[in-house]
Regions:
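Bacterial N-terminal signal peptides that target proteins for export
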Residues: 1-13
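Bacterial N-terminal signal peptides
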Residues: 10-22
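Sec/Tat signal peptide C-region and signal peptidase I cleavage site
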Residues: 23-27
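Flexible "cap/lid" subdomain of the alpha/beta-hydrolase fold that forms the substrate-access gate
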Residues: 29-34, 45-47, 52, 59, ...
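Short acidic-hydrophobic surface loop/beta-edge motif
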Residues: 36-42
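Conserved HGGG/HGGXW glycine-rich cap/lid loop of the alpha/beta-hydrolase fold
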Residues: 51-100, 291
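Short, amphipathic alpha-helical "lid/cap" segments that border enzyme active or binding sites
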Residues: 115, 240, 317-325
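Catalytic histidine-centered segment of alpha/beta-hydrolase-like enzymes
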Residues: 308-316
Length: 330
């Protein structure tokens, strides 16, 4: 990260809750939108989403990860709306109020399917181009949209950088310490793991939150707001499918095969991008130097200091808002 970026993101952290609370007070009506979920048919789904800010503002789509939900952006979205952005925060397939339109559609969690969902959502909302930002599954989804549909992406904010992969890569063993960090992926590869996650979804998710962000002191009330979204009837199936697909244990759907072939060569991302990394990210993640060359357009990287872990928009919303604004202006 260049010196200017270092000052910028460190300053954003220093501003802390004062800036955030100011935005929250000014945007109380917008913040209430998180309790007023809208629904729209898009592709295979009826997608639940929040839509706040001026309708003629620059669209920003914020994508959550696993096992999180749209509440990761409960403070980011109103702050961006106050800056004039139209902010859309969808539930991914298998979360919250998002539902499949047909009982016969495979409950498929492969990454390119989730990316296609976002393109379908943009089409349904008549959004030609948007700023995309995400972490965990959301970052991977945003990366894929930027790689396959760059004309639809004005800018990108991706926590942990370039997360595009392939089944061929997923089949290759890693060093023992790295394999250990993916323990839940191997657990989900077994019938016991699927049954265990179904039986203990909330406890499992809370455990992952602690592991991924070891210094994040979230409250029971904060977790409970998200836990409800994990009660989606397709959540377990989508989760298991996602991790099994990565290991090559599921083939995925034929209609996404063309996307997967293009992603397998690890295409560059050409849109203006800011990548972020939390200093205390306890989840598996690549080193920034390892993916720098994959971003061939305007680019900056920001390291978020202190206790910030795997979920920067919820752990340090001020810095995340700054990153979205800066990426939009690159």
């Amino acid at each position: 990260m260049n010196r200017l970026s270092l000052v910028r993101y460190t300053s954003a952290v220093a501003l802390g809750l004062s800036t955030l609370w100011s935005a929250a007070v000014c945007a109380a009506e917008d913040a209430g939108a998180f309790d007023k979920i809208q629904q729209i048919r898009a592709g295979d789904l009826n997608i639940g989403y929040v839509d706040i800010g001026p309708r003629d503002g620059q669209p920003v789509i914020l994508l959550h990860g696993w096992p999180y939900d749209i509440q990761s952006y409960a403070q980011v979205a109103p702050a961006l709306a106050q800056k004039g952005y139209r902010v859309i925060v969808p539930y991914l397939r298998g979360y919250g109020t998002t539902r499949f339109l047909s009982a016969g559609t495979p409950r498929n969690g492969q990454p390119s399917a989730m990316a296609a969902d976002i393109v379908h959502l943009m089409d349904a909302l008549n959004i030609r181009q948007a700023d995309l930002a995400g972490f965990d599954w959301g970052a991977r989804t945003a990366d894929i949209v930027a790689a396959l549909w760059p004309q639809r992406v004005k800018s990108l904010v991706s926590v942990s950088g370039y997360l595009i992969s392939s089944q061929q890569i997923g089949e290759k063993p890693l060093p023992p310490q790295a394999e250990l960090s993916w323990w839940y992926q191997f657990y989900f590869a077994t019938p016991r793991g699927e049954a265990g996650y179904r039986q203990n979804t909330h406890d499992f998710a809370k455990f992952i939150w602690h592991q991924a962000s070891p210094q994040w002191q979230f409250s029971d009330a904060t977790f409970a707001k998200t836990a409800r979204a994990l009660d989606n009837p397709d959540h377990v199936a989508i989760t298991i499918s996602n991790y099994r697909w990565r290991l090559g244990l599921e083939k995925g759907e034929a209609k996404y095969a063309g996307y997967e072939q293009r992603l397998a060569v690890l295409p560059p991302i050409t849109v203006p991008t800011i990548t972020l990394e939390g200093a205390n990210n306890g989840a598996p993640h690549p080193a920034p130097a390892s993916y720098r060359a994959k971003f061939t357009g305007k680019y900056e990287h920001g390291d978020l200091p202190g206790a910030v872990g795997h979920n920067p928009p919820q752990e340090d919303p001020t810095a995340f808002v700054q990153a979205v604004v800066d990426a939009d202006r690159l």
